[in-house]
C-alpha cells in the first residue's frame, strides 16, 4: 500500500544593479552598490552565496530523514512477517508462545515496538491464515493460536477443502489484483507471497507448495484467470479474477478484507470503493431479477397469473 523528493535550493539571482554594465554601449551612472567599498560587496556576496548552500543542506537532511523512515517501515514490515511465520511454526507443537521468545528470536532490538508488531501480526494471522492470536496469561505474557477464520460461504468451504488459510491466501491474491486495477503480473503475486514470508516454490506447512496451489487449484477451479500479457517478449503472464470469484465473492468483501489488513476504512481508496459500490448495485439488480423470475415460474406452475 510514494514520496516526492524535496525541491533543491536554487542560486539567488543578482539584483539589477549587480549585473554587468549597460545595454548597447549605454553608459550608466554609478549606482549605490557600485560605490560601496569592495569589502562590503564581498561580504554581501558571501552572505548571499551561503543561502543556497544552507537550502541544499536542509534538503539533504530532509531526504536522509525520509530514507530513514522508509527503511524503518520496511524493517517493521519484515519483522511482522517473520513473527507471523514464527508463531505458525510454534503452533504446530500446540505449545504456548511467550513474549520473551518472540523478542529473543524475532523482534530483538525492536522490542519497544512490541505492541504495534504483535497487533499487526495478529491481523495477518486472522485475515490471511485463519488464526486468532489469544493472550491467555497476562502475567507471563503467554499466547496461543486458535483456528477461527470462517469461510465466506458454505460452498466455498467445500471447494477449498474447509481450509481457512487457503481462503485467506486467495483473498490476499484477489485483493492484490483488485487494488492494481483488476490485474496483477505473475511476478507481483510471487513478490507478495515473499513479503508474507511464504516462498512460492518451497513447501509450506499450511499451503503445501504455494505456486502449485495457485496454478493448479485456484486457476483450475476458476477462482483465478491466468493469461499471457500481449506484446511481451520474453513472455510475461498476469492474473485476474476468475468467473467463480466474480460469482461468489464481491469486490466490497475483498476491499473490506484489504482495509482490515491496513487498519483503514474502504473509503480510503476512492476509486476502488466507487467500483465496489457499483458492483454491489449490479449484484442487487441481478438478484432482484432472479427472484422475480423464480416467482413468475412458481406462479405459472401453480396456475396463478400475477398480471
Swiss-Prot record:
Q: Which SMART domains does the record match to this protein?
A: MAGE
GO biological process: any one?
protein ubiquitination
Keywords from the UniProt entry:
Tumor antigen, Ubl conjugation pathway
- Residues forming the MAGE domain are 76-277
- Tissue expression profile of the protein: Ubiquitous.
Q: Where do the segments described as Disordered lie?
A: 1-55
InterPro entries assigned: MAGE (IPR037445), MAGE_WH1 (IPR041898), MAGE_WH2 (IPR041899), MHD_dom (IPR002190)
User: What Pfam families does the entry give?
Assistant: MAGE
Of the GO CC terms on this record, one is: nucleus
Per its UniProt entry, which superkingdom is the organism in?
Answer: Eukaryota
Keyword Cell division annotated: no
Q: Where is the composition biased (Basic and acidic residues)?
A: 16-27, 35-48
Q: How does it assemble?
A: Interacts (via MAGE domain) with RING-type zinc finger-containing E3 ubiquitin-protein ligases LNX1, TRIM27 and NSMCE1; the interaction is direct.
Q: Which PANTHER family match?
A: MELANOMA-ASSOCIATED ANTIGEN F1 (PTHR11736:SF61), MELANOMA-ASSOCIATED ANTIGEN MAGE ANTIGEN (PTHR11736)
Which function does this protein serve? Enhances ubiquitin ligase activity of RING-type zinc finger-containing E3 ubiquitin ligases. Proposed to act through recruitment and/or stabilization of the E2 ubiquitin-conjugating enzyme at the E3:substrate complex. MAGEF1-NSMCE1 ubiquitin ligase complex promotes proteasomal degradation of MMS19, a key component of the cytosolic iron-sulfur protein assembly (CIA) machinery. Down-regulation of MMS19 impairs the activity of several DNA repair and metabolism enzymes such as ERCC2/XPD, FANCJ, RTEL1 and POLD1 that require iron-sulfur clusters as cofactors.
Protein name per the record: Melanoma-associated antigen F1
Organism equals Homo sapiens (Human)
Taxonomically, what lineage is the organism? Eukaryota, Metazoa, Chordata, Craniata, Vertebrata
Amino acid at each position: 500500500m510514494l514520496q516526492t523528493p524535496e525541491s533543491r535550493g536554487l542560486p539567488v539571482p543578482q539584483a539589477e544593479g549587480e549585473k554587468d554594465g549597460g545595454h548597447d554601449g549605454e553608459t550608466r551612472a554609478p549606482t549605490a552598490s557600485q560605490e560601496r567599498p569592495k569589502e562590503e560587496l564581498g561580504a554581501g556576496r558571501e552572505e548571499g552565496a551561503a543561502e543556497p548552500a544552507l537550502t541544499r543542506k536542509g534538503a539533504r537532511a530532509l531526504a536522509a530523514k525520509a530514507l530513514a523512515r522508509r527503511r524503518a517501515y520496511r524493517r517493521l514490515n519484515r519483522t511482522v512477517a517473520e513473527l507471523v511465520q514464527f508463531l505458525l511454526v510454534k503452533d504446530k507443537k500446540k505449545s504456548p508462545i511467550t513474549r520473551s521468545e518472540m523478542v529473543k528470536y524475532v523482534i530483538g532490538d525492536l522490542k519497544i515496538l512490541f505492541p504495534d508488531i504483535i497487533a499487526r501480526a495478529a491481523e495477518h494471522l486472522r485475515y490471511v491464515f485463519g488464526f486468532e492470536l489469544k493472550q491467555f496469561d497476562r502475567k507471563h505474557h503467554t499466547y496461543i493460536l486458535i483456528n477461527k477464520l470462517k469461510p465466506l460461504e458454505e460452498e466455498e468451504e467445500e471447494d477449498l477443502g474447509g481450509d481457512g488459510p487457503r481462503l485467506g491466501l486467495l483473498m490476499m491474491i484477489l485483493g492484490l489484483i483488485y487494488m492494481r486495477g483488476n490485474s496483477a503480473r505473475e511476478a507481483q503475486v510471487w513478490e507478495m507471497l515473499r513479503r508474507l514470508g511464504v516462498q512460492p516454490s518451497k513447501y509450506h506447512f499450511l499451503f503445501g507448495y504455494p505456486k502449485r496451489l495457485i496454478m493448479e487449484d485456484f486457476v483450475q477451479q476458476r477462482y483465478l484467470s491466468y493469461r499471457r500479457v500481449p506484446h511481451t517478449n520474453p513472455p510475461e503472464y498476469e492474473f485476474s479474477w476468475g468467473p467463480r470469484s466474480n460469482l461468489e465473492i464481491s469486490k466490497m468483501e475483498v476491499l473490506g478484507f484489504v482495509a482490515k489488513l491496513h487498519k483503514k476504512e474502504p473509503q480510503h481508496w476512492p476509486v476502488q470503493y466507487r467500483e465496489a459500490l457499483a458492483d454491489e448495485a449490479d449484484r442487487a439488480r441481478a438478484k432482484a431479477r432472479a427472484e422475480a423470475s423464480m416467482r413468475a415460474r412458481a406462479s405459472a406452475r401453480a396456475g396463478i397469473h400475477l398480471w
